[in-house]
Regions:
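Hot-dog-fold acyl-thioester-processing enzymes
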Residues: 5-66, 109, 113, 122-135
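A short acidic/small-residue loop/turn micro-motif
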Residues: 118-120
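Hydrophobic beta-sheet segments that form the core/acyl-binding groove
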Residues: 70-106
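Hydrophobic residues positioned within well-ordered beta-strands of beta-sheet architectures
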Residues: 14-16, 69, 85, 99, ...
Length: 135
């Protein structure tokens, strides 16, 4: 199934530049699993910069879990290709924390975009926590 992902990037955008390695590819193209790992890596780096990364949340007994995601892939990157990855977070709504991603070539050709909804979870209780309640 194909989803249309409409993304409005905000001031809290974070950017990462990467190059696709042979280990990330199959038949010369980026593996789908590697695409989502790249998204996960930039999300983690951005969360760390915002003070809500893994090392910030774990001492509070909290973690982020993905509830759903969707992506539109126009073309998979090729081995050796240099890319620009951008992410931003959206407005929290009913406990859900949206995060958006866009993947470009160095020439700004849009290759893929994705939207993911995260929820903040209590590690012990295994229930959702409102981010506004966390200090």
């Amino acid at each position: 199934m194909r989803y249309s992902v409409k993304i409005i990037f905000m001031k809290n955008e974070h950017e990462m530049r990467i190059q696709i390695t042979k280990e990330q590819t199959e038949d010369g193209q980026l593996k789908l699993s590697q695409l989502f790992l790249i998204f996960q890596n930039i999300a983690g780096e951005h969360a760390d910069l915002l003070g809500c990364g893994y090392d910030d949340l774990l001492p509070k007994g909290l973690f982020f879990a993905i509830t759903n995601s969707r992506a539109e892939i126009r073309r998979m990157p090729k081995e050796g290709e240099r890319l620009i990855l951008r992410t931003c977070i959206g407005k929290v709504s009913h406990l859900f924390c949206p995060r958006y991603y866009r993947l470009y070539t160095e020439d700004e050709e849009l290759l893929a975009e994705s939207a993911v909804r995260w929820v903040l979870m209590d590690l012990q209780k295994r229930c959702a926590v409102n981010p506004a309640d966390v200090k």
